[in-house]
From Swiss-Prot:
This is Aspyridones efflux protein. The chain crosses the membrane at residues 66-86, 127-147, 158-178, 185-205, 216-236, 260-280, 287-307, 335-355, 368-388, 392-412, 416-436, 454-474, 528-548. It comes from Neocamarosporium betae (Beet black rot fungus). CDD domains: MFS_Azr1_MDR_like. Keywords: Cell membrane, Glycoprotein, Membrane, Transmembrane, Transmembrane helix, Transport. Belongs to the major facilitator superfamily. TCR/Tet family.
Amino acid sequence: MHPDQADTAAMQQQTTTECSDRSRPEKAEEGHAREHTVTRTCSREPEQTATATKPTGLKLICLTTAICLTIFLISVDFSILATAIPAITAEFKSVADIGWYGSSYLLTTASSQLLLGKCYTVFDLKWTFLLALLTFEVGSIICATAPSSVVLIIGRAIAGCGNAGLLSGALLILTHSVPLEKRPLFMAMTGGTYGVAAIAGPPLGGVFTDKLSWRWCFWINLPIGALTFLVIVFLFKSPPRSGFDGSRSWLAKVMRFDPVGTLMFMPAIICVLLALQWGGTTHAWNSGIVVALLVVGGVLVIAFGIVQWLMHDDATIPLRIIKKRTIWACAAYQFALGAAFFVFIYFLPIWFQGVQGASAIQSGVRTLPMLVGNIVATAVSGVLVTIIGYYAPFMILGTILASVGAGLLLLFTPNVTAASWIGYQAIVGLGIGFGWQQPFVAVQTVLDIKDVPIATATLSFAQTLGGTLFVSVAQTAFSTKLTQELVSQVPQLDPASILHEGGAAELDKLVPEQYLPDVVLSYNNSLLSAFFVATIMAIMSLVGCTFVEWNSVKGKKADAVPAA
């Protein structure tokens, strides 16, 4: 063997040993009474992969732009309909279908994310991503040309299937385009884009609806998607994938996709989400259909867990991955922080419209403080993690700021000052921005590159599930509290007329002038119940950042706090 080759082999062996020992407790030297944990960190990618094959210069700029455009599509499509729904229901005479415009999209997204994460481990990354993008665009075209409410719902469901593979695919393309130590900065760009699009969606939808047509909320996806498609086709080179072993039987090949687990997981998620969507609104919580959905969903989740244990490496989420402390801690963090973020994104515009009488566009503009805070913190954290190497401190800081800001939002009253609602939102935005992207950096730091697709899909799923579940929980809390408040404060009015016959922006049309102050106060107090749900979830993100390992993206060693 050539001496250089021998040195290289020795270095690779040393790196492997250090990686495998990252969390191994070691005894202190003789004469010391206690043991301590040494946390070893290293890049899980071979050096030659991390440097020689990464795109640079204009090519990297174009790929990063395409990834940010993808993130923009994902995020804005989630929120842009908020201000377009009144125009849609007016055209289709479909008030009863309002809930399905959002839930059909989220149901297919949440139930498909893990399956598509599995596809990324087997099939070519580029073409799997492009297929997901094409599916999303087809769904958008169906929505933009929909002649009826039913067709619009079908289009949203198809777009949701495509969306399920876009976030994890975009982050995987970034993973294979940027060295690990530089990824936090690029992750900050994608995180900032996500925040901008999520908060800009409602006012953008209002502009399209007022100036053009609600259908432009979907047409806008086509040119953005087309540009992204072309950039990825011509500039991104896929890494090698395992594909199918020719020696395997056809049954073994099919089992790589964990069909049994998938057939249990998808209906489980659909059952739980439908129960939360209908419970307390369409049906009572103790109604037979809601109870049945919760029971069936719970049983299927348990069965899915058993299948994952039996399937080993062919499981949708292999236990060897999810058992790693950083992975489950990051998933818990994303679930909780995603829940808080999406509840605020959904309910803050309603507060501005219902309590302060703002228009749809004005309510979107008044959420800009959260957007600015998000962008600033995302950019700052990306730079600092790149410099110092450690992401865990920013997860902790994100939890603290998001929790404090969310708690301050509970002080809202109809007469709250502009300085207060600007400042409180900015604090929440800073918290979300500091913490939002760090889990994606963390999983890339602690896992082998071949396991990153599954972990990335798991984190994306946790975000989506947290937001979906707790927007429904917050909606139930809001509706229940509003009914109680209206019965107590203005018994002369029928609560059903306020809840179902108009939106937050139409209170002055629905309510006689002498009762309006009491109804506005009831609206404020009820929305605080939704904010309380978000506050609890922001605090719960402490669980994730407490247990995440303190590893460095720069490959340095760090000693943990000595154990008692």
